[in-house]
């Protein structure tokens, strides 16, 4: 019988918490900003590599997002060393940072649904206005 959560999933979950704390408290690079969220971590089966998915709140500019990812990638060695001190792992995974646009895309979809519902409400309240157009 297989375990519900394997070791890579448990390590990824703990890494997500620790990296979020490190980004909040230790990273002082202005390109990263204060509003960086770690939305997920995927760890390889051998725990040698980790993909870290981050979002930058209040950053709608694509250049700022790219600069933030580059800053995180440049600081990945430092983050990895702090991660090694925080977690007791024999091998600390090599970190690669990716921008996770699912939060932004979800907000966009939510706004679209809200506007469609609002438009339907207006049409239901004023059915004559739709026929005149």
From Swiss-Prot:
Question: One GO biological process from the UniProt record?
Answer: maturation of SSU-rRNA
Task: Quote the subcellular location field of this record.
Answer: Cytoplasm
UniProt key word Cytoplasm = yes
Q: Which GO terms describe its cellular component?
A: cytosol
InterPro entries with a match to the protein in the record: KH_dom-like_a/b (IPR015946), RbfA (IPR000238), RbfA_dom_sf (IPR023799), Ribosome-bd_factorA_CS (IPR020053)
Query: Which Gene3D superfamilies does the entry link to?
Result: 3.30.300.20
The cross-references to Pfam families, in alphabetical order and at most eight, read:
RBFA
Oligomer and partners? Monomer. Binds 30S ribosomal subunits, but not 50S ribosomal subunits or 70S ribosomes.
- Biological function: One of several proteins that assist in the late maturation steps of the functional core of the 30S ribosomal subunit. Associates with free 30S ribosomal subunits (but not with 30S subunits that are part of 70S ribosomes or polysomes). Required for efficient processing of 16S rRNA. May interact with the 5'-terminal helix region of 16S rRNA.
Record protein name field = Ribosome-binding factor A
Origin organism of this chain? Cronobacter sakazakii (strain ATCC BAA-894)
Gene that produces this protein: rbfA
């Amino acid at each position: 019988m297989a375990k519900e959560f394997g070791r890579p999933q448990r390590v990824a979950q703990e890494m997500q918490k620790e990296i979020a704390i490190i980004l909040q408290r230790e990273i002082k690079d202005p390109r990263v900003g204060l509003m960086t969220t770690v939305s997920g971590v995927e760890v390889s089966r051998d725990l040698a590599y980790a993909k870290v998915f981050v979002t930058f709140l209040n950053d709608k500019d694509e250049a700022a997002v790219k600069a933030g990812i580059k800053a995180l990638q440049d600081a990945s060695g430092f983050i990895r060393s702090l991660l090694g001190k925080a977690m007791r792992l024999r091998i600390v995974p090599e970190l690669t940072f990716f921008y996770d646009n699912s939060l932004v895309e979800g907000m966009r979809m939510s706004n679209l649904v809200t506007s469609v519902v609002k438009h339907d409400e207006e049409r239901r309240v004023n059915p004559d206005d739709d026929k005149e157009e």
